[in-house]
Amino acid sequence: MKNLLALTALLAPIALIAPDVAEAQGVVTSADPRATEAGLEILNAGGSAADAAVAMMLALTVVEPQSSGIGGGGFMLHQTANGPLETIDGREKAPAAATPQRFVGADGKPLPFIQAFPGGKSVGVPGNIRLAALANKKWGKLRWKALFAPAIRLAEGGYKVTRPLAAASTNLAPLWGGGSTAVAGPEGGTSTGTGAAGGRFPDAAELYTRNGKPLVEGETVTNPALGKLLRKIAADGPDAFYTGQNAKALINAVTATRIAPSDMTAADLAAYQAKERPPVCGTYRGYKICGMAPPSSGATTVLQMLGMLERFDLARLGKDSPIAWHLIGEAMQLAYADRELYLGDTDFVDVPVAGLIDKGYIAQRSGLISETRALGTYEPGTPPGAKPRTYAPQQEVPGTTHFVAIDAEGDIATMTSTIEGPFGSQLIANGFALNNELTDFSLAPEKNGAPVANRVEGGKRPLSSMAPTIVYDASGAPIFTVGAAGGKTILMQVTKAIIAHLDWKLPAKEALGLGLIYFNKDGLVLEQGTSLPAMKPALEAMGHKVSVGRLGLKANAAEKTATGWIGAPDPRSVGTALRQ
């Protein structure tokens, strides 16, 4: 029976310890303090881990609108104490009328990303509300309506603007009103472009600017339209999002815009369903690692990187060794090459998941890695069961959010949620930002005359880097869970955190805070402001091309210790962890 305790009658005071906390009973962590508090409120009211995760997703819709929300989608892993690991795919879908030519210009060439992401055509059918409803049905203890209370209070009563929200408003405000804009990650801009001017996105400007000026950290924002919608969905169930007035508002937003109007229909919304998929699992140094199946590339790519590194003694090398980071960089680029060629929505393309994580295949790929010299060229391999594919890498903008809830019974809900780039498509419906997830498809439908696996197709879910992950010890007990935000860096952030925790024995807080190595078309990128840039000369001596830069990172994790679970947000973020 659903627990009917009033949410206002908290059984214990909120205990906030930043950036990590030890568990008394349940533990929650997210990238925003108000969302973390929402999760704790639900746990204190008798809610389950899944209930708390749903409440955090809803609260993040309000207070972290640049990163995620009900206008987007997500993936949830749920581990029942002494029970099965299950997953829910709430990834957005392309409208039924979408074709592979969606992002091809009049000249027959794929649009530049800066032109493709704003407006209606980039919006996928949102999945988070269906995901939330399925999670509450399967694992919930509280009634559906109760999960909305914290988010409704924030939307109607107001919330203070954080540094990341202010930065995103500053970066995107020129686009809303015309002129040039920086496409921002969680903490800043990553690329710049210019579009047609003249108040292109007035609804976003109305919500997230003041008198034409960007939001300022510390000022108070309310969102009564979103509060009203949340009340409606809370009272009437998930269909209130996918049908009726909200469906009309959403369809109007994406079809009536003068910026790339969409072909999405009310039927597309009404037909959307979240999907349960079997998890994808593998092993690393005796530990079991589990994550999402496609259309997430999380489990396959993370397991490939870890598998290629398993023959190297990373523990002996240590976190301060340039050789260790060289090896990680090599495995990363080989695994990402496979990702770009083979991964996509398995409802539309054959993805050789088993072959990609096959031990023999991974050993073959690992054999390409030298301890002393960069490979230089990182081509996809041919895993068992693979069909010929066309290689067409696609850009992802840093964004997204991750959060974790663990309840007193030991159930774990770990979820990554997104609208893709900051403020998604820049379109607003009933106070929530609409995603630009369809730009996660390959903008080029074919290459050298052959179709690309991740091309746009009607009803298809785009490939995703979201990678909620759970690590189990040799006895099968969960000991670590992690996920991240930041576009394609997510996969490397998760892998780095696992290596730091398992090989280098760092606690969750330090594992997340450790610097990151990534790559672009010009070579390796070392995260500035960390210990890694000091390794630039050593890596260059091994044959790498190396630059230093900001990467827009944001992760959350929880680890099991002798005294219970400990939650940790990324020290780069404004996130928190709370305990009961």
Task: Report each predicted region and the residues it spans.
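Bacterial N-terminal signal peptides
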Residues: 6-16
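Glycine-rich phosphate/pyrophosphate-binding beta-alpha loops
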Residues: 290-299, 400-404, 414-426, 484-491
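Short, small/polar residue-rich loop motifs at catalytic or cofactor-binding pockets
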Residues: 276, 397-400, 464-466
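Active-site rim segments in enzyme catalytic domains, especially the processed small/beta chain
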Residues: 62-69, 75-87, 258-265, 411-475, ...
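Noncatalytic scaffold domains of N-terminal-nucleophile
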Residues: 19-37, 41, 47-50, 54-236, ...
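Internal maturation/activation junctions in enzymes
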Residues: 311-418, 570
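Extended C-terminal subregions enriched in glycine
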Residues: 459-461, 494, 503-550
